[in-house]
């Protein structure tokens, strides 16, 4: 077997240029070929950026720094497992020719690339930008003394002129660099945005911080054209300041735009254009929408098979990058069980969940499966099922209908213990799992919920417990406060007419007690979707993702004050998986929140 590798443009190219690599392989043996692409800068070691896939094309946008890179491709015959490896050099040069910064347009009309001269090692740099009314800044990058400093500038209004300058920080002193200007472009026609309406404007008590709202909006399921709205960031007036153009495709209907990552990147689970199936890829993108790294369900399953684990059928709901550079991902698993399981009169297909810890090269390092650690006969209380065509379910491969047993919908890494907090929507439970930074047993350490290990104290509510909850997270960098969106399906099934709630729980893990610090009724019943977040000012943001679900569905972002009253409210004419309030597109929370 031999393999060749060709770039779309000749070297050298400037920082921020997209280079498309095409691999061409030949093999005298029959069999399907797939390809893995890796990149190395200097002698820092290769990092896999696109794991084995039948696609022989790799798009690479080196936006951080110039240097002498090595691009490596491995071609593999899936029948014989024979491989062929080729490594080629490619030079990336700085955009900065002298002592002045350079501001360049990108392929995204609302994102610029700011390039500053190298700065002394031990110092750091960030960029401020303003349109004269609204100001913000990038994250802070460390200087290395020899390479230019490059920043994506995002969170900008369309067709607007901004003034920018870098700030050099050395010890306790800061020095402003020269100013420059950049004018954003217009948003192209045809981009599918939801319509935003502000019900209650932001007031001083709820607009001092986190004045950006990042929304993962699905299309309206009543009048759907199977085309999702693009993930969109707006200000608190509903004006667009960023969007991800990569979702402008019917293939991504029902896919997940997961979460922002500190520094200005984003995690998502898009469809696979090779198969047409949704939720088949894990992808990290930069602010301009370029893919940084990617792997697939197919590649994950190749590794799970070698580990003796069940295959997965689709990524969903959540992912998180860990302090050690690993990434938690989750996916659905499917298994057929004999008659009698969960009360079935015939063999029954059951959907469970799998958590995987991927190392820096996106290789599976640790696996947790609900089928291994949970009681298969603890059936979900509302007898929910998935079909192969349900947009809120993964693709099914074993049967046309499956019991939707667990429906895990959030992951929350716990820095103090290295464990994971997970939400099982269809079980009305929250679990703490022994992860121990990738060497844990996987055992369930405790269960929080109506039938769990904790006693609810101090509440007169006839049904204080959450059900079918979303976005369960510890707050304040600790383990004593949990926020969540209580959809309330089980409670409302038994008490028609009630509504979803925003909840904040005080939890004592040593005494196994929990109390309600906040239990606020939402404007209606959202049977799915939703998020919860403590804001820097002490208020809480709740996203009721699917209100008025039977007629004219919409999502509503609500800021709740500590006394339970509503502040800022914004609605969009979509169903919204999650909503994040952010200081900037580079930072979700202020330190200590």
Regions found by a protein language model. Give the residues of each.
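Extracellular acidic, Ser/Thr/Pro-rich low-complexity tracts
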Residues: 23-29, 77, 116-121
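Short, solvent-exposed loop/turn segments at the edges of extracellular beta-sandwich modules
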Residues: 76-82, 169-173
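Histidine-/acidic-rich catalytic cores in large beta-rich domains
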Residues: 94-113, 118-129, 161, 167-593
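Surface-exposed, short loops/turns at beta-strand junctions within beta-sandwich domains
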Residues: 62-68, 153-161
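Short beta-strand segments within Ig-like beta-sandwich modules, predominantly Fibronectin type-III
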Residues: 48-55, 139-146
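A short beta-strand segment in extracellular, disulfide-stabilized domains
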Residues: 17-25, 111-113
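Solvent-exposed loop segments of extracellular immunoglobulin-like
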Residues: 29-36
